[in-house]
Curated annotation (Swiss-Prot):
It comes from Brucella anthropi (strain ATCC 49188 / DSM 6882 / CCUG 24695 / JCM 21032 / LMG 3331 / NBRC 15819 / NCTC 12168 / Alc 37) (Ochrobactrum anthropi). Keywords: Pyrimidine biosynthesis, Transferase. GO terms for cellular component: cytosol. GO terms for molecular function: amino acid binding; aspartate carbamoyltransferase activity. PROSITE patterns: CARBAMOYLTRANSFERASE. This is Aspartate carbamoyltransferase catalytic subunit. Disulfide bonds: none annotated. It comes from the Bacteria. The gene is pyrB. Belongs to the aspartate/ornithine carbamoyltransferase superfamily. ATCase family. It is an enzyme of class 2 (transferase).
Length: 322
C-alpha cells in the first residue's frame, strides 16, 4: 500500500494579502487563532513552538498597536524578536528597501514582518529574502492580519460569518483594512456593504462584489456588523471632506444612526479611533462595541499566522507555495 503524503494545513510561505488565500486557508488560520486565545488567557503565556526562530519587525510607518501585537505574538510563541527602528536606520541615510532586505536576509531571520507606505512593498521584499514575510500593511493595498482578526472577532460573537450583513463605513478610498476585509468577508459568504461619501470611494467598487451606499441610514439598515474606518487625513493631499464636523454629522457613528442596524449589531473599529470624527464615544464604549476584543484577537491571529508559516508540524515544507 502506497503511503500518501498529508498536505500541510497552511501551504503558503508568506502572508502578503487575503487575495490568493482560499476559504480553507482562511478557516485554517481562524481555527488555529481560536486555540491561541487560550494561551494568551492563561497565567503562563508561553509556547515553545518557535523557540530558536528569529522574527524581525520592520516598520516604515509608525504603528504602536500592530507592532506591539506582532512583538507579543512572537514572544508568546517562543521566538527571538527584534524590532528594527527605521527612524535610526540606514534607510534614513538613503538605503533602499531592497538594500535593507538584503542586509537583513544575511542575518538569517526566519520571518520578516513589514509595514510600508508603498503598495506592493511586502511582495517585493518576499522576492528578495529567503525567509517568510508577513504583510503588516502596505499603503492602501492590504492589511491581511487585520481582516483575519476582524473575522475572528465576528465569528466568535456571531457563531459564523456566512450570510451576515457587514457594513464597512468611512474612508474606504485610503483604507487597506477595507480592501482586505472585503476580500475575506466575500470569501466566507458575508453580504458586504460599503458606506462612504463619493469622494472617499475608490473606483472599481462594483467589481469587488459589494453594495455601495452614500447614506449611513440606508447602508446600516439591518446590518449585523458595523465596521467603522479611520479618516486618514495624513494620506489626503486635497479636500476630500468639507470639515471634520460635517463628516461626523453625516458619516460618524452615533446612537441614532446605529438604531437602523440590527439590535444586536456589532460595532467595530480597527484603531486608532478619532472619537467624535468616525465614532461617538458612547458608541465606541457602548455594549455593542467589540473594539477591545479586536485588540485581543489581534495577538491570537498573529500568533496563528507565524505558527502556521514556521511550525514544521503544521507546514512541513515551511511553505514551498507563495
Amino acid at each position: 500500500m502506497t503511503n500518501q503524503t498529508v498536505p500541510p494545513l497552511f501551504p503558503h510561505r508568506h502572508l502578503l494579502g487575503i487575495k490568493g488565500l482560499s476559504p480553507l486557508d482562511i478557516l485554517c488560520l481562524l481555527d488555529l487563532a481560536d486555540q491561541e486565545i487560550a494561551v494568551s488567557r492563561q497565567p503562563e503565556k508561553k509556547k515553545s513552538v518557535l523557540r530558536g526562530r528569529t522574527q524581525i519587525n520592520l516598520f516604515f510607518e509608525a504603528s504602536t498597536r500592530t507592532q506591539s501585537s506582532f512583538e507579543l505574538a512572537g514572544k508568546r510563541l517562543g521566538a527571538d524578536v527584534m524590532n528594527m527602528s527605521v527612524g535610526n536606520s540606514s534607510v534614513k541615510k538613503g538605503e533602499t528597501l531592497i538594500d535593507t532586505a538584503m542586509t537583513l536576509n544575511a542575518m538569517q531571520p526566519d520571518i520578516l514582518v513589514i509595514r510600508h507606505a508603498s503598495a506592493g512593498a511586502a511582495a517585493l521584499l518576499a522576492q528578495k529574502v529567503g525567509c517568510s514575510v508577513v504583510n503588516a500593511g502596505d499603503g492602501a493595498h492590504e492589511h491581511p492580519t487585520q481582516a483575519l482578526l476582524d473575522a475572528l472577532t465576528i465569528r466568535r460573537a456571531k457563531g459564523g460569518i456566512e450570510n451576515l450583513i457587514v457594513a464597512i463605513c468611512g474612508d474606504v478610498l485610503h483604507s487597506r483594512v477595507a480592501r482586505s476585509n472585503i476580500l475575506l468577508l466575500n470569501a466566507l459568504g458575508a453580504r458586504v456593504r460599503v458606506v462612504a461619501p463619493s469622494t472617499l470611494l475608490p473606483s472599481g467598487m462594483a467589481d469587488m462584489s459589494v453594495e455601495v451606499f452614500n447614506s449611513m441610514e440606508e447602508g446600516l439598515k439591518d446590518a449585523d456588523v458595523v465596521m467603522m474606518l479611520r479618516l486618514q487625513r495624513e494620506r489626503m493631499a486635497g479636500s476630500f471632506v468639507p470639515s471634520v464636523r460635517e463628516y461626523f454629522r453625516f458619516y460618524g457613528l452615533d446612537k441614532e444612526k446605529l438604531k437602523v442596524a440590527k439590535p444586536d449589531a456589532l460595532v467595530m473599529h480597527p484603531g486608532p479611533m478619532n472619537r467624535g470624527v468616525e465614532i461617538a464615544s458612547d458608541v465606541a464604549d457602548g455594549p455593542q462595541s467589540v473594539i477591545q476584543q479586536q485588540v485581543e484577537m489581534g495577538v491570537a491571529v498573529r500568533m496563528a499566522v507565524m505558527e502556521a508559516l514556521l511550525d514544521p508540524r503544521r507546514n512541513p515544507s515551511n511553505g514551498e507555495a507563495a
